UniProtKB/Swiss-Prot annotation:
HAMAP family: Ribosomal_uS8_B. InterPro entries: Ribosomal_uS8, Ribosomal_uS8_CS, Ribosomal_uS8_sf. Keywords: Ribonucleoprotein, Ribosomal protein, RNA-binding, rRNA-binding. Transmembrane segments: none annotated. GO terms for cellular component: ribonucleoprotein complex; ribosome. Part of the 30S ribosomal subunit. Contacts proteins S5 and S12. Belongs to the universal ribosomal protein uS8 family. This is Small ribosomal subunit protein uS8. The keyword Cell division does not apply. GO terms for molecular function: rRNA binding; structural constituent of ribosome. It comes from Syntrophus aciditrophicus (strain SB).
């Protein structure tokens, strides 16, 4: 049986690994997950990512987490906004700010998966996938 929400699974794995200071975490591979990882890397929330094969030959997205020191984390929280049961769409002029601009909303738009700031600059709306701060 397939997974209902691979994005939520990815965010939960990152959140859990981040809380126990893992260096990396393996996530289910999907195109959207790779695009979210690109945005997280670009905004500085993760150290990087790779696409690898597991022992069965399936693609796995390996996300490398980063920490400023041994006690603190860069990602304070990461939350799914739009869910399979309740999709959340916003117009280009109604894009929410996360913690008054300290956090980032990741939005799936017609221009690709981008941050809330980029979506405001391009004046393009879309589905709010998650919030990170």
């Amino acid at each position: 049986m397939g997974m209902t929400d691979p994005i939520a699974d990815m965010l939960t794995r990152i959140r859990n690994a981040n809380r126990v200071h893992f260096k990396s975490v393996d996530v289910v591979y999907s195109g959207v997950n790779v695009n979210i990882a690109k945005v997280l890397k670009k905004t500085g929330y993760i150290g990087g990512y790779d696409v690898k094969k597991d022992e069965k030959g399936h693609d796995v997205l390996k996300v490398y987490l980063k920490y400023p020191d041994s006690k603190r984390t860069i990602i304070n929280d990461i939350q799914r906004v739009s869910k399979p049961g309740r999709r959340v769409y916003v117009k280009g002029d109604e894009i929410p700010k996360v913690l008054n601009g300290y956090g980032v909303a990741i939005i799936s738009t017609s221009k690709g998966v981008i941050t809330d700031k980029e979506a405001r600059e391009k004046s393009v709306g879309g589905e709010v996938l998650c919030k990170v701060w």
